[in-house]
């Protein structure tokens, strides 16, 4: 952490950005909202979809370890950017699923998205905490609050949007568009 007169002020900005970053990273835990529409749309059963969440948690943890190692070599900015890019690619691939390939769901959401979020999670947590040597508990609590609040905030938004996109998907499949 740089020692200068702006440090007391700038650290709160970094904490705010960190909380927002963790809010978006926490969307990983909204899997239960996505599970039912995927089962309905593609005919996948509960055990197949549960396996995806198991993979997601494994690769999220591995991504955290990998993110820590990459941050030492590439720096925190590049590691967070790489994590964000991986998560974005994973979400785009997941959104483009046509139901013909369950392994593609496992790869896109379970591996790519989770690894990217793991990269960002670990690096954001450790980087922002470095700005708060006197308030590590407050800092980590605020960051983890952002991660946990994601299911409430973004999960509720996703829950509201899924019926709209699902109706569009069904209309497109039946030739209504």
Please place each PLM-identified region on the residue numbering.
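Extracytoplasmic
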Residues: 13-14, 20-36, 44
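Residue-level signature of mid-helix packing/kink "hotspots" within the transmembrane helices
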Residues: 57-65, 152
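Helix-to-loop junctions at the C-terminal end of transmembrane segments
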Residues: 64-75
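C-terminal ends and interior cores of transmembrane alpha-helices
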Residues: 86-99
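Hydrophobic core of transmembrane alpha-helices in multi-pass small-molecule transporters
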Residues: 104-118
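Intracellular juxtamembrane helix-capping segments at the cytosolic ends
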Residues: 119-132
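Glycine-rich segments within core transmembrane alpha-helices of 12-TM secondary carriers
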Residues: 137-154
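Conserved small/polar residues in nucleotide/adenosyl-binding loops
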Residues: 167-174
